[in-house]
């Protein structure tokens, strides 16, 4: 197919007549627009080389990029590949191209388009008004000469955006790669005629880029000289915002003279610098003209304050090759070296402060070696249709290719481990199928014309379909379950409405017909938010749904310099001449400063008090040493850049080993604990070993986990419904079958989670607990129905800000908020809590109408909490230079006490020198504390605490009365059995049950008591406590006396409401469901019947609606179709008994630790005081209320003294956990560590540290310096950073069928890194739960979509909620990245426009043993 219409106006018929009408939609003939080679930046290796071309390439190094519509972006692209039909050498020298170097050669029957990658694309001759379409490159080339294109043409609307003179000129050509534009205008430079010329000069046989025009008619113009030595060259650019740039050009003679003058002034002998250059190179004809510098000469927003230096400057070799690049500060940032024999052939390059990478070529000009002195080197061997790549670790990869020139594709890849993957392509090089190493094939169906994917079929036959409008914009996506995503656009192609699969509608409004920036958005709640923009497309103000405004200031380079929020809250940023962030100042003037090395790595963070956090880097910018407060951590890497050893502050080591595919295969911890991992051909984890504990992982055909076996016995089992949605997880815990069951509505939203526990022998149901969720008409999850409680309804305003809470029909809590939507007043009956904030936004006070509970907070310049004052006492806190809590000074009327906290360098608790001056302990190298002032400790080989015994001081006569605590664990390192003995007699024994997710669902406790014979022994019958959960939050505790249920503040682990119901009252509430009642009496003979599950689900929904007095129209229609009424069904329902309940409000501190329980009458029914680590100091409990919640996420176990903390058990006496972190080093280097500043940080999951209940990430101390102490890998682009993050987590996301998300951060040197991913839900994640560390800037976000096993088409595209996140001005991110189940890597900008879409991410289930 030629990419031309089947019948073209101007073509001749068989009988000689010309065609006057043609079809613009049907294309015929041989392919047109085929490139001479594959894209240089496509398949790359190392630093980088394109092995398909055998070329050294440097894709897209950007020197200038100011914000604005149609901005002038000066980027350099290098390729050593030489096309047979090159365009002339551009102003960056041989081998280099920039966007302005696009050129069209006009030959007799051929058009040759030279792109900015150094390639040639071949098109057939075009008649006026005709177009050619390259299906392999997705590129249109159109010749002017008509006022309109055919109405059915995809470019018809974009064509009309052009000025009429351009459309009508048959001598101009235009190119675009999208129906949304922009157009690249290909014209000629008007030459000034000579004095003796009478007739106009003939047009040249080529066209050059003269400008761009977008679909709004905005233009970017390249000004070319009409005469003189630079005739035809670009000497100026006017961008779409009317900024003017001057391009300073030089000739070879001028550069030679400048070199001679510099030598003379420097007193040196001039080097050989010829006045002329050869007129031809392997990269095309060369006129010797080079770009010397680019100046900004006019800026409409800053007309009086133009830069005093060029934005970029270039230096040249005597042979006219690009030698150096200087940034706008005048500092050299790049250098290049070229072959002595072949002009323009790059043999080395370096970034300033980085090692030099060198290259060797064969006689055909192909790269054969890539030499890296501080990392991996590569060799390349070329054979016909085969390229072998071998790195310096002797790992070999073989690429098998098919096709020629621009259609060459890798069809088979042999990996270093011997596995093979294969790909299939259509005739124009578009991917049709991929087969993984296990032989499973995923098929892709591209549209025959556009190449857009219309269908994806996975190996198990599941398919997703995508639909587009005539402008190639996605209009709907439909999956096997029939749910649909829909998008609508206006006539300019701007998104105006999106309907998500769950029915959630978002609308976008525009007030400027010449802009794609929305002026307002409306969400499903009807809330409207407005935005104003600068002429450069920068956000100036954002007005939320309440009319509150946030304003933004920027500098001319697009960097944000200030943010002004309501309530007087502002932040100011300062940058150096390189654009690196050097200072951040808050409203109160507290300033944090930043320092960098020559390579731009952040080397120091100076806090407002002058303390420094320092980081040292290796040659490639990887952190090798971090120092804070005299404590140092170090990291070592191998040649492949993989971490191979960590050295803690104590000098201990953790080591890592990898396989040939860079997968972790062994980890040996600081304490010697060794874990090993084995993978199958597709990379899935199939076996893990943990000090002899062997686990096997089993998967189904869709790569979903089906079960695990541990020590040969079945552990967890996963079950899925026909849609692939997870419905059940079960396992055996202490002989009991424990399961979790999930229910969803017709839109795939979670509506119920039920835990069940069955008897080991009889399988009788011992316990079940269900939490249900409901959604309002706008799709907000605003209702939760706890087990055996009325519905909890969250009252919101605007886009979901919390305004109140109801239990059933009873309003319980009301909130008042300030102009930042922060809580300022909370009301619960007579109880009122008033909250105030400092000018910097920190908590300043919490005052109650009960003065004794008032609290005032004081912070130091570093943002550390240093004092909490109340009417009863004042506590002052001191910290080390590493941010660790070192002491507490408590003063009151009759009290003045100082309590010190001492730790070794790694954060392990030590005896305090003041209290124990004779102690010689200085550190615990393996982080296993063996003794303290009170106990001796023993651990097993997994690092689990197994025994704790009373310490008998030296000199004390032993009486064998010491108490011994013993701890026993299951294969998942969960505590399942605890005993405490004295005189070798048991005092207490307890056993614990867990569900498959690791949540504790029951405990049984036997206590020592006197039996009928008078002997003391453990009770025969245990005290049994059952637990119920809603996600990761413990909501129900029930024993034989009462049930206590907790309602938490939304999105946190801070308890809000406590509901207690006597067990006897609960028994009266037992009733049949409507479905059960109908089934038991539904037979014709009066006997029972069994309803199908779908009918049971519909009846359950109807019953919940009747009980809530909110019967939906859908349910009424369904009943009517059955000849029934709501009243009839209501008469079939068992009566509802409302039990007597005690309701209290939790009054908590700033962390979420309960301080008091307030009755509905406003009285304090219980109150307590704790130390900083959660130890109970005092308690007033006149009503004998059971209040077991401690620090957020923790439950006190009276029998052991430990706090259950979701994934682990916390020992408050030591301020640490008794087992190692299940997520390994992701939770911090000390695997036992709780946060070392418990005044500000919490850890509600027993995993990684949280700064507070809302953020969910550790940002203090060294963690704040590097985010993750292994030292986050840093990149030069957001794109590369996001790809790295998603490449690491996409497999695990597929395994768990959960979304993961995090942020992309920009450090002060302008480099990027990702924060650690946090787990979301099956259909939702929130990247801001993993915030950027202090001193860095969030610029983007990334997330995954889990597994596509449930057939949801939108797993492959951005959802409406995704787009809300990126478009929200509150979030202030530039883009949002997505890793899909099929391995697609996608991105949209903050206007919802797709900016990246390519394959390459893992698309099979692989998990890390620690996870």
Swiss-Prot record:
Repeat is among the record's keywords: yes
Annotated region (28 X approximate tandem repeats), positions in chain: 330-1186
Pfam families: DUF4329 (PF14220), DUF6531 (PF20148), RHS (PF03527), RHS_repeat (PF05593)
Function: Rhs elements have a nonessential function. They may play an important role in the natural ecology of the cell.
Keywords carried by this UniProt record: Repeat
Protein name (record): Protein RhsB
Keyword Repeat: yes
Organism: Escherichia coli (strain K12)
Domain notes: Each rhs appears to consist of a highly conserved 141 kDa amino fragment followed by a highly divergent C-terminus.
Sequence repeats: 330-352, 353-374, 375-417, 418-438, 439-460, 461-481, 482-502, 503-525, 526-546, 547-567, 568-588, 589-609, 610-629, 630-650, 651-671, 672-691, 692-711, 712-734, 735-758, 808-828, 829-850, 851-871, 872-894, 895-930, 931-959, 960-984, 985-1019, 1162-1186
Gene3D superfamilies the record matches: 3.90.930.1, RHS repeat-associated core
Similarity field: Belongs to the RHS family.
InterPro entries: DUF4329, DUF6531, RHS, Rhs_assc_core, RHS_domain, RHS_repeat, T6SS_VgrG/RHS, YD
């Amino acid at each position: 197919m030629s990419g031309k219409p089947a019948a073209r106006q101007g073509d001749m018929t068989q009988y000689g007549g010309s065609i006057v009408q043609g079809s613009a939609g049907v294309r015929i003939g041989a392919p047109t627009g085929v490139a001479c080679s594959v894209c240089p930046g496509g398949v790359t290796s190392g630093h980088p080389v394109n092995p398909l071309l055998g070329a050294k390439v440097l894709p897209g190094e950007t020197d200038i990029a100011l914000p604005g519509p149609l901005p002038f972006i000066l980027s350099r692209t290098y390729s050593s590949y030489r096309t047979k039909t090159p365009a002339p050498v551009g102003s960056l020298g041989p081998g280099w191209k920039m966007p302005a170097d696009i050129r069209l050669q006009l030959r007799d029957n051929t058009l040759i388009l030279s792109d900015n990658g150094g390639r040639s694309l071949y098109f057939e001759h075009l008649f006026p008004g005709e177009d050619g379409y390259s299906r392999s490159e997705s590129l249109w080339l159109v010749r002017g000469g008509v006022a309109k294109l055919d109405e059915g043409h995809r470019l018809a609307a974009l064509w009309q955006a052009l000025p009429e003179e351009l459309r009508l000129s048959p001598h101009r050509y235009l190119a675009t790669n999208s129906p949304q534009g922009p157009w690249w205008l290909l014209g000629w430079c008007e030459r000034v005629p000579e004095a003796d010329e009478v007739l106009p000069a003939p047009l040249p046989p080529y066209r050059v880029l003269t400008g761009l025009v977008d679909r709004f008619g905005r233009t970017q113009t390249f000004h070319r000289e009409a005469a003189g030595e630079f005739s035809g060259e670009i000497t100026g650019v006017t961008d779409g915002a009317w900024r003017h740039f001057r391009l300073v050009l030089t000739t070879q003679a001028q550069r030679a003279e400048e070199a001679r003058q510099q030598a003379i002034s420097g007193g040196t002998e001039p080097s050989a610098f010829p006045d002329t250059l050869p007129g031809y190179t392997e990269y095309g004809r060369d006129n010797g003209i080079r770009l010397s510098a680019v100046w900004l000469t006019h800026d409409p927003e800053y007309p009086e304050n133009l830069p005093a230096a060029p934005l970029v400057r270039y230096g040249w070799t005597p042979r006219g090759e690009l030698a150096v690049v200087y940034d706008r500060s005048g500092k050299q940032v790049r250098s290049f070296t070229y072959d002595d024999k072949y002009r323009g052939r790059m043999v080395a390059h370096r970034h300033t402060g980085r090692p030099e990478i060198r290259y060797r070529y064969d006689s055909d000009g192909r790269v054969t070696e890539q030499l890296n002195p501080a990392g991996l080197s590569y060799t390349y061997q070329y054979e016909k249709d085969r390229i072998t790549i071998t790195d310096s670790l002797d790992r070999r990869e073989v690429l098998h290719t098919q096709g020629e020139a621009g259609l060459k594709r890798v069809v088979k890849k042999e990996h270093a481990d011997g596995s093979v993957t294969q790909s299939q392509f259509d005739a124009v090089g578009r991917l049709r199928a991929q087969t993984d190493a296990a032989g499973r094939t995923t098929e892709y169906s591209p549209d025959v014309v556009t190449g857009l994917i219309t269908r994806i079929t996975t190996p198990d036959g599941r398919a997703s379909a995508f639909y587009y409008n005539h402008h190639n914009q996605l209009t709907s996506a439909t999956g096997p379950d029939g749910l649909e995503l829909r998008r609508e656009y206006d006539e300019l192609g701007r998104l105006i409405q999106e309907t998500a699969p769950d029915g959630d509608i978002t609308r976008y409004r525009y007030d400027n017909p010449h802009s794609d920036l929305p002026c307002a958005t409306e969400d499903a709640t009807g809330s409207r938010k407005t935005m104003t923009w600068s002429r450069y497309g920068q956000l100036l103000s954002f007005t939320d749904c309440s009319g509150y405004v946030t304003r933004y200031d920027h500098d001319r380079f697009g960097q944000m310099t200030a943010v002004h929020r309501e309530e007087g809250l502002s932040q100011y940023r300062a940058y150096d001449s390189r654009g690196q962030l050097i200072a951040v100042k808050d409203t109160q003037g507290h300033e944090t400063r930043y320092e960098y090395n020559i390579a731009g790595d952040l080397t120091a963070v100076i806090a407002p008090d002058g303390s420094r956090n320092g980081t040292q880097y290796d040659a490639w910018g990887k952190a090798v040493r971090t120092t804070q407060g005299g404590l140092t951590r170090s990291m070592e890497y191998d040649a492949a850049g993989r971490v191979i050893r960590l050295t803690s502050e104590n000098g201990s080591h953790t080591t890592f080993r990898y396989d040939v595919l860079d997968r972790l295969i062994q980890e040996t911890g600081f304490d010697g604990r060794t874990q090993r991992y084995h993978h199958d051909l597709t990379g899935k984890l199939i076996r893990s070993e943990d000090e002899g504990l062997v686990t096997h992982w089993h998967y189904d055909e869709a790569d979903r986990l089906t079960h695990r076996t541990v020590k040969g016995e079945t552990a967890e089992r996963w079950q899925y419904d026909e849609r692939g949605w997870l419905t059940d997880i079960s396992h055996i815990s202490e002989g009991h079958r424990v399961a979790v069951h999930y229910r969803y509505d017709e839109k795939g939203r979670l509506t119920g989670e039920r835990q069940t526990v069955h008897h080991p022998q009889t399988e009788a149901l011992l316990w079940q607990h269900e939490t249900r969720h409901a959604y309002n008409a706008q799709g907000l999850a605003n209702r939760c129905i706890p087990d055996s409680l009325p519905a909890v309804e969250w009252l919101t305003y605007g886009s979901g800000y919390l305004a109140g809470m109801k239990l059933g029909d009873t309003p319980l809590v009301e909130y008042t908020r300030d102009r930042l939507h922060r809580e300022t007043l909370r009301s619960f009956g007579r109880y009122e809590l008033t909250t105030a904030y400092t000018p910097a936004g920190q908590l300043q006070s919490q005052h109650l109408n009960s003065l004794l509970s008032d609290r005032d907070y004081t912070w130091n310049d570093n943002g550390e909490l240093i004092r909490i004052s109340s009417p009863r006492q004042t506590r002052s806190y001191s910290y080390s230079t590493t941010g660790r809590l070192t002491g507490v000074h408590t003063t009151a009327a009759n009290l003045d006490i100082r309590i010190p906290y001492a730790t070794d360098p790694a954060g392990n608790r030590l005896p305090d020198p003041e209290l124990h001056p004779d102690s010689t302990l200085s550190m615990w190298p393996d982080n296993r504390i063996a003794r303290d002032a009170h106990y001796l400790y023993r651990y097993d080989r997994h690092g689990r605490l197994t025994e704790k015994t009373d310490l008998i001081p030296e000199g004390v006569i032993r009486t064998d009365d010491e108490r011994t605590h013993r701890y026993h664990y299951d294969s998942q390192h969960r505590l399942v059995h605890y005993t405490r003995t004295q005189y070798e007699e048991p005092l207490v024994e307890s056993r614990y049950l867990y569900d498959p997710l690791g949540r504790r669902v029951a405990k049984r406790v036997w206590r020592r008591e006197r039996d009928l014979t008078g002997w003391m022994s453990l009770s025969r019958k245990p005290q049994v406590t059952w637990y119920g959960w809603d996600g990761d939050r413990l909501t129900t505790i029930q024993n034989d006396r009462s049930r206590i249920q907790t309602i938490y503040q939304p999105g946190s682990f801070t308890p809000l409401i406590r509901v207690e119901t006597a067990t006897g009252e609960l028994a009266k509430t037992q009733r049949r469901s409507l479905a059960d009642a109908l089934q038991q009496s539904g037979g014709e003979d009066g006997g029972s019947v069994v309803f199908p599950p779908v009918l049971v689900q519909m009846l359950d929904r109807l019953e919940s609606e009747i009980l809530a007095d909110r019967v939906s129209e859908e349910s009424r229609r369904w009943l009517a179709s059955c000849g029934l009424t709501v009243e009839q069904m209501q008469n079939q329902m068992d009566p509802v008994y409302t039990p007597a309940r005690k309701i209290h409000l939790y009054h908590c501190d700033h962390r979420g630790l309960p301080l008091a329980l307030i009755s509905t009458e406003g009285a304090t029914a219980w109150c307590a005081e704790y130390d900083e680590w959660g130890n109970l100091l005092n308690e007033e409990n006149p009503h004998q209320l059971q209040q077991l919640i401690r620090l957020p996420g923790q439950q006190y176990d009276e029998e052991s003294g430990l706090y259950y903390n979701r994934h682990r058990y916390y020992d408050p006496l030591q301020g640490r956990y008794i087992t190692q972190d299940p997520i390994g080093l992701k939770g911090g280097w000390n695997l036992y560590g709780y946060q070392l500043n418990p005044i500000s940080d919490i850890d509600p999951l027993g995993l990684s540290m949280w700064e507070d209940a809302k953020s969910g990430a550790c940002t203090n101390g060294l963690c704040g310096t590097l985010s993750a102490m292994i030292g986050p890998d840093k990149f030069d682009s957001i794109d590369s950073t996001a790809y790295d993050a998603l490449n690491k987590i996409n497999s695990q996301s597929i395994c768990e069928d959960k979304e993961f998300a995090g942020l992309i951060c920009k450090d002060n040197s302008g480099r990027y890194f990702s924060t650690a991913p946090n787990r979301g839900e099956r259909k939702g994640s929130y990247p801001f739960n993993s915030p950027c560390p202090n001193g860095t800037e969030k610029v983007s976000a990334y997330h995954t979509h889990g597994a596509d096993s449930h057939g949801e088409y939108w797993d492959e595209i951005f959802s409406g909620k995704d787009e809300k996140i990126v478009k929200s001005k509150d979030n202030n991110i530039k883009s949002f990245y997505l890793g899909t189940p099929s391995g697609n890597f996608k991105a949209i900008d903050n206007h919802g426009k797709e900016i990246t879409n390519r394959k390459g991410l893992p698309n099979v289930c692989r998990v890390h043993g620690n996870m």
